[in-house]
């Protein structure tokens, strides 16, 4: 009975945790972003084998954030986590010109999945503090983002280590999620 009332309360007042996946190739900065969002500072990370899951509160909204490993051997398992996802933060290393094609292939395959049909897409053009970084518009074109017609998406210039661009990206995500409900 208590569960019934708490679910009514949650639906009326929007206290449900939003489910967000942080995806991208290995070394893009996914785990650094997760912990920067959660604790507000850079923490030492190691390559993610499997996943990290944390609750992040941003602007009074609670997010259950899943950071999935990006190694070639782990990417096929991403689909196991797609169900009930509200948004995908897709992190791309702006300096990794050699693998932008692989990043695009993974993004396209992911967006074709039925379980992610309604998920909002936020692309973090990460490592923008580096001199050789591609611009967000170069990256958007390389990833084929302008061709996405039936998907709410945005790309942001970010640096996980410096913390730049994360607030703007999260602000957009929060507003987009709120307007969708």
From Swiss-Prot:
Disulfide bonds: none annotated. CDD domains: Arl1 (cd04151). A lipid is attached at residue 2 (N-myristoyl glycine). Changing residue 71 to L: Accumulation of GTP-bound form. Changing residue 2 to A: Abolishes association with the Golgi apparatus. Mg(2+) binds at residues 31, 46, 48. It comes from the Eukaryota. It is found in: Golgi apparatus membrane; Golgi apparatus, trans-Golgi network membrane; Membrane. Keywords: Golgi apparatus, GTP-binding, Lipoprotein, Magnesium, Membrane, Metal-binding, Myristate, Nucleotide-binding. It is a peripheral membrane protein; Lipid-anchor. It holds the Pfam family Arf. GTP binds at residues 24-31, 45-48, 70, 126-129, 160-161. GO terms for molecular function: enzyme activator activity; GTP binding; GTPase activity; metal ion binding; phospholipase D activator activity; protein domain specific binding. InterPro entries: P-loop_NTPase (IPR027417), Small_GTP-bd (IPR005225), Small_GTPase_ARF (IPR024156), Small_GTPase_ARF/SAR (IPR006689). GO terms for biological process: Golgi organization; Golgi vesicle transport; intracellular protein transport; protein localization to Golgi apparatus; retrograde transport, endosome to Golgi; toxin metabolic process; vesicle-mediated transport. Belongs to the small GTPase superfamily. Arf family. The GTP-bound form interacts with GOLGA1. The GTP-bound form interacts with GOLGA4 and RGPD8. The GTP-bound form directly interacts with ARFIP2. Binds to SCOC, preferentially in its GTP-bound form. May interact with UNC119. Interacts with ARFIP1; this interaction directs ARFIP1 to the trans-Golgi membranes. Interacts with ARFGEF1 (via N-terminus). GTP-binding protein. Can activate phospholipase D with very low efficiency. Important for normal function of the Golgi apparatus. GTP-binding protein that recruits several effectors, such as golgins, arfaptins and Arf-GEFs to the trans-Golgi network, and modulates their functions at the Golgi complex. Plays thereby a role in a wide range of fundamental cellular processes, including cell polarity, innate immunity, or protein secretion mediated by arfaptins, which were shown to play a role in maintaining insulin secretion from pancreatic beta cells. This is ADP-ribosylation factor-like protein 1. It comes from Rattus norvegicus (Rat). The lineage of its organism: Eukaryota, Metazoa, Chordata, Craniata, Vertebrata.
């Amino acid at each position: 009975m208590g569960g019934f009332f708490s679910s009514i309360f949650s639906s009326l007042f929007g206290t449900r945790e939003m489910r967000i996946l942080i995806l991208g190739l290995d070394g893009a900065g996914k785990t650094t972003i997760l912990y920067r969002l959660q604790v507000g500072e850079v923490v030492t990370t190691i390559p993610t084998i499997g996943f990290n899951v944390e609750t992040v509160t941003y602007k009074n909204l609670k997010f259950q954030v899943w950071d999935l490993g990006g190694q070639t051997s782990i990417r096929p398992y991403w689909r196991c986590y797609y169900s009930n996802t509200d948004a995908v933060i897709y992190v791309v290393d702006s300096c990794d010109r050699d693998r932008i094609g692989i990043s695009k292939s993974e993004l396209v395959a992911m967006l074709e999945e039925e379980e992610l049909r309604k998920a909002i897409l936020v692309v973090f053009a990460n490592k923008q503090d580096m001199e050789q970084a591609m611009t967000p518009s170069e990256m958007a074109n390389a990833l084929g983002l302008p061709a996405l017609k039936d998907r709410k998406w945005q790309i942001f210039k970010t640096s996980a280590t410096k913390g730049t661009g994360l607030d703007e990206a999260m602000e957009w995500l929060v507003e987009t999620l709120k307007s969708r409900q």
